């Protein structure tokens, strides 16, 4: 299974699609489908049928998943390029700034199995 540079709770920047340029928080990662659900992005309207609980029925808005390649981690309000370096105690994600310097963003332990 592919490892992502974004995880639940991160703020991401949308790179492509109808919501290009928007930012939002990652609500969930669907790793088997390579998709993420982002708060306030790719909002769809769903119709709920009439039932005894909802005699009139209703319409609700839900966030639909988007492909992980269409989002990038947002650092200081702009999309950031991250490079992955593997160390002896796990994986580290480095943020490359425009001036050429690198700064440690996150250190992640590898999962077994």
Curated annotation (Swiss-Prot):
Q: What function is annotated for this protein? A: One of two assembly initiator proteins, it binds directly to the 5'-end of the 23S rRNA, where it nucleates assembly of the 50S subunit. One of the proteins that surrounds the polypeptide exit tunnel on the outside of the subunit.
Subunit note? Part of the 50S ribosomal subunit.
The Swiss-Prot or TrEMBL record annotates one GO molecular function as: rRNA binding
Q: Could you give one GO CC term from the UniProt record?
A: ribonucleoprotein complex
> What family is it from?
Belongs to the universal ribosomal protein uL24 family.
- What processes in GO biological process is this protein linked to? translation
**What is the species of this protein?**
Chlamydia caviae (strain ATCC VR-813 / DSM 19441 / 03DC25 / GPIC)
Q: List the protein's name.
A: Large ribosomal subunit protein uL24
Supply the SMART domains for this chain.
KOW
The record ties this protein, via SUPFAM superfamilies, to: Translation proteins SH3-like domain
Membrane-spanning regions, if any? Answer: none
Give the Pfam families listed for this entry.
KOW, ribosomal_L24
What keywords sit in the KW lines?
Ribonucleoprotein, Ribosomal protein, RNA-binding, rRNA-binding
Highest taxon of source = Bacteria
Q: InterPro entries of this UniProt entry? A: KOW (IPR005824), Rib_uL2_dom2 (IPR014722), Ribosomal_uL24 (IPR003256), Ribosomal_uL24_CS (IPR005825), Ribosomal_uL24_KOW (IPR041988), Translation_prot_SH3-like_sf (IPR008991)
């Amino acid at each position: 299974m592919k490892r992502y540079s974004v995880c639940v709770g991160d703020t991401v920047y949308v790179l492509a699609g109808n919501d290009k340029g928007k930012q939002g928080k990652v609500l969930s990662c669907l790793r088997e489908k390579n998709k993420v659900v982002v708060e306030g992005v790719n909002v769809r309207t769903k119709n709920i049928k009439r039932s005894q609980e909802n005699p009139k029925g209703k319409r609700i808005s839900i966030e639909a998943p988007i492909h992980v390649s269409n989002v990038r981690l947002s650092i200081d309000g702009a999309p950031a390029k991250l490079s992955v370096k593997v160390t002896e105690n796990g994986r580290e994600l480095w943020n490359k700034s425009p001036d050429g310097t690198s700064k440690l963003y996150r250190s992640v332990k590898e999962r077994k199995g």
